[in-house]
Amino acid sequence: MLRERFLTGGAEAMPDYELLELILFRALPRQDVKPLARRLLDVFGSFGHVLAAPPARLTEVTGVGEAVVQELKIVEAAAQRLARSRVLQRPVLSSWQALLDYCHTAMAHRPTEQFRVLFLDRKNLLIADEEQARGTVDHVPVYPREVVKRALELDASALILVHNHPSGDPTPSQADIAMTDQIRHAAEALGLVLHDHLVIGKGRELSFRAEGLL
């Protein structure tokens, strides 16, 4: 049985459709959920994209009802909570891989652009992670003044900007570069440090700092 294989061999030995079956079993007990698991993967392309899909999109798939959506969203929330716990209130700069893992878990599979700001204290501990804006498939509106204002409200000393590219390609646009420069200037004027701007793609990310863009 799938459950026994999962308990003895772990998820690494299971293909995506079988792991998805285990989740679907909870919503649809005593049903053959393999066809639905494969259908979801065909529609959304990957396990991560299935979990991140909006409820309205999920229910367009034949066989998906409220119970299935609920189970998928519980798993998505649990994965994000676990990844977040590995970076919250920890020195971010020395836990960089954990931070990247969290950003990929939270943002890599989203169908539209999302812009987040990670606020750090004087010891570079992550004190807040907030979504600042949501956009379309290729644009998200960001207001530098609001970002800096929020940093002051939180008594933050440094920032890390993060946004995703639903296309999967993390190459920054000219608008991304210009916006980052505006936030950097606004932050520096108030004594705040902009450590980096991460663009999250599918399976990889781009660091403005590493690319010499900061």
Curated annotation (Swiss-Prot):
Residues 92-214 form the MPN domain. SUPFAM superfamilies: JAB1/MPN domain, RuvA domain 2-like. The keyword Hydrolase applies. GO terms for biological process: proteolysis. The keyword Hydrolase applies. Induction: Induced about five-fold after UV-irradiation. It comes from the Bacteria. Belongs to the UPF0758 family. This is UPF0758 protein. The lineage of its organism: Bacteria, Pseudomonadati, Pseudomonadota, Alphaproteobacteria, Rhodobacterales.
